[in-house]
Curated annotation (Swiss-Prot):
Highest taxon listed in the record's lineage: Bacteria
Segments forming domain Integrase catalytic: 23-206
Gene: insD8
Described purpose of this protein according to its UniProt entry: Involved in the transposition of the insertion sequence IS2.
UniProt organism field: Escherichia coli (strain K12)
InterPro entries found in the cross-reference section: Integrase_cat-core, RNaseH-like_sf, RNaseH_sf, Transpos_IS3
Gene3D superfamilies xrefs: Ribonuclease H-like superfamily/Ribonuclease H (3.30.420.10)
UniProt-recorded name of the protein: Putative transposase InsD for insertion element IS2E
Biological process according to GO: DNA integration; DNA recombination; transposition
Pfam families referenced in this protein's UniProt entry, alphabetically: rve
A single MF term (Gene Ontology): DNA binding
Amino acid sequence: MPAINAKRVYRIMRQNALLLERKPAVPPSKRAHTGRVAVKESNQRWCSDGFEFCCDNGERLRVTFALDCCDREALHWAVTTGGFNSETVQDVMLGAVERRFGNDLPSSPVEWLTDNGSCYRANETRQFARMLGLEPKNTAVRSPESNGIAESFVKTIKRDYISIMPKPDGLTAAKNLAEAFEHYNEWHPHSALGYRSPREYLRQRACNGLSDNRCLEI
């Protein structure tokens, strides 16, 4: 069988309009990540994201969480068998504010950093955030490193907890996930915190009455 001339085939297909339309190149983001996600003081910036995992019986659980970008504490989280939606995000927002401020609201806006998921961009989500004293901020499109603290947390939770905890079904997995979040906050060391856990770092800061910068030097 004679060899097929690919260039000739291409030329004939082009002449007869048989080629697929070329996908336009995606322009580079005008909001390229150039700064740091971490901040020097607690309650300046929180970040939020979501992830999912599968139980042994095939159930899929979807988790939404919020972290402080300074002390790394997991402020609040929610798990569901449904999709990522605005209602769940609002529950996490409210839980995070209650965790840090009780019945009060922040005295100055706390930046709420997320990706561009529809549950975060929804008008009702953004309006609710501002009611709670949060200022919604979205990362640059196609720039996951812009929410690197949340991305790193997902890897840690999946690697150090979810991969080894019993998860025969959704109910059992949710209970064990609650213990995982508690263990992370109390015991998981962070290099950025001088190899202390989030709550160990917070307790030491409160005990010494020092700023976050000074705590990092201890």
